[in-house]
Amino acid sequence: MTSKPSRSRARELATKVFSALLNILYPRRCPSCRAITKDDSFCPACWVRLLFIENPCCFVCGEPLDTRYGGDLLCAACLKGRYNFDRLLSVFIYNKTIARAIYRFKFKRQAFLSKFFLKFLLKKLEPIKSKVDLIIPIPIHRKRLKWRGYNQTLLLARDISRETSIGCIPDLLLKNRHTVAQTTLRFRKRKSNLRSAFEINPNYLEPIRGKNIMIVDDIFTTGSTVNECAKILKKNGVGRVFILTIARTLLNKKYRTPNSL
C-alpha cells in the first residue's frame, strides 16, 4: 500500500512538472517589452525605467512636487480648487514603459494583467483604505465595451474589492452616450466631450448617500473624466470621492524625473 507521504510527494512532483511544462509552453513575459521573465513582473530592463510616485506630492491630485517640505502640500491647480474629487493616488508616473503595459491590458485583450497591476494598486490604496465604503469603475459605453471586449477598470475594481472586502458596484455610474476617445482631444475639448455623458444609476441613490466612494481608472491625464464622475457623485449625496489609478501624467512639465524613458 502506498503511504500518504509518498502520495503527497508524488502530487508535489506532478505539480512541479506541470508548472515547468506551462512555463515552457507559455513562458512568463514582461507586460511592457514582452521579454521572458522568471516571475510575474517587469523584466530588469523595464523595472529600472518605472517611475514610482512618492512623497512629496500634492495631497489632493497626487502631482509630484519639487520641494523638500513635508506635510499635506497642494499644487497650484489644487490651490485653485480645480478638482471635484478629494484625493487621487497613482502608482506610476506615465512613461513609455508603463504605457506599453497599460496598452496591452486595455486594447490587446490581455485581461490577466489586472492581477499583475493589483499588487501595486493594493499597496497604494493603504493610506485611504479604511475611509473607502464602496469601489466603482469608470463606465464605458456599450459600443466601446463590445469593441474592447471588457471594461479594464471594472476588472481592477472587482479584484481590489475581492482583496479588501470593500463592496463594488459595477453599474453605479452609467455612460449614457458614446464619446470621442479622450486621448484624441485637447484639454478644453475633453471637458466638453464628457458633458452629460455620465449619469447615476437611480437604483443606488439611497445606498450611496453619505458614502465615501473610490473610483478606479487606468490613467489620470487631465482629470476630465474622473472630475466629471466625482461631480455627479457629489451632486447625488456622496460623501468623499477618492481616485485610484495605475499611472498619471505630469501637469508640471518642468518636474525632473529620474529618467523619461
PLM feature spans:
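Glycine-rich phosphate/pyrophosphate-handling loop used in enzymes and phosphotransfer proteins
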Residues: 1-217, 221-261
